[in-house]
């Protein structure tokens, strides 16, 4: 995999490299190859992934065809608003009698 570094901008080149690696699935493969995976476990995992993909595709097709309603969008987290600072009370001169 090759990435061009333009104008000595290494940060941008790293971002491009990471994006390419993510797209190619290299990070996922590296994570899987950290430890040995028995062939039976590998087959079970790949089968589960295939089932998951098929379900997702069927769900998207059903939504597109109008057979089921699209899921409601999740509400965005909104930071609580701070109350406006109350004006300081005017100090009245105290009289001592």
From Swiss-Prot:
Gene3D superfamilies: Ribosomal protein S8. Residues 76-97 have a biased composition (Low complexity). Signal peptide: none annotated. Residues 37-97 are annotated as: Disordered. The keyword Glycosyltransferase does not apply. Transmembrane segments: none annotated. Keywords: Ribonucleoprotein, Ribosomal protein. GO terms for biological process: translation. GO terms for molecular function: structural constituent of ribosome. NCBIfam families: S21p. Belongs to the bacterial ribosomal protein bS21 family. This is Small ribosomal subunit protein bS21. It comes from Methylobacterium sp. (strain 4-46).
